[in-house]
A protein has these predicted regions:
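Signature for HUH/AEP ssDNA processing cores
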Residues: 45-119
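N-terminal nicking endonuclease/strand-transfer module with a His-rich metal-binding environment
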Residues: 8-28, 61-64, 69-72, 130, ...
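DNA replication initiation on ssDNA origins
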Residues: 1-58
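Conserved His + Asp/Glu catalytic blocks
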Residues: 107-109, 116-122, 128-178
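Intrinsically disordered, low-complexity Ser/Thr/Pro/Gly-rich regulatory segments
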Residues: 36-37, 79-80, 131-137
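Sequence-level detector for tyrosine residue identity
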Residues: 5, 10, 22, 26, ...
Length: 178
């Protein structure tokens, strides 16, 4: 370990993350510190995005495993909704999903993120812990509860490299004001 660094180690299940950062007490003896530089707005945006991806990557690694569901909830073409309506639909969907999970004695874990497609259509990505028993499974429950369009479901095979967290944390563009 180099002098002037702090090492944090994060146990994320199958992976171990090591983060090294400056202590803030660096510089040679007898030399004055350089004047502090104000970060530019671009630096702040870049730093905030890096922290968002880092925290989301750890959250995904701690709470989800291989075999969980990556679901895209879409709206029917003739029934496009506003941003506010989409938020209400999603809150209602999550409430119903929690009720159904509790009914079977399961714990619901999810991360959801709205997105606007290339042609302006709103859709929602949701990472969901997959559960099943002899009666039902997560995919069947989602198909029953999402009545606004077609849920597209995929199985998550790799959570180690953080690509999924990076995709979820991508900043929204051209979003209607809240």
């Amino acid at each position: 370990m180099k002098c002037g660094y702090i090492r944090d180690t994060w146990d994320c299940g199958e992976t171990l993350e090591v983060e090294e950062k400056h202590t803030g007490r660096y510089g040679a003896r007898g030399q004055k510190r350089e004047p502090k530089k104000e970060p530019t707005p671009e630096d702040i945006i870049r730093q905030n995005q890096w922290k968002r991806v880092r925290d989301l990557r750890r959250l995904v690694k701690w709470n989800f495993t291989t075999g969980d569901s990556w679901i895209t909830l879409t709206y029917q073409k003739d029934k496009r909704v506003s941003w506010e309506e989409m938020i209400k639909h999603m809150q209602k969907f999550i409430r119903k999903l929690q009720t159904r999970y509790r009914k079977y004695g399961w714990t619901l874990k999810y991360i959801w993120r709205p997105q606007i497609g290339k042609r302006g259509a709103i859709h929602i990505h949701i990472l969901l812990n997959a559960e099943s028993n002899t009666e039902t499974r997560t995919e069947k429950i989602v198909r029953e509860l999402w009545i606004h369009g077609n849920p597209n479901m995929k199985v998550v095979y790799d959570l180690k490299n953080g690509d999924l967290a990076e995709y979820i944390a991508t900043p929204l563009r051209n979003v209607a004001p809240r």
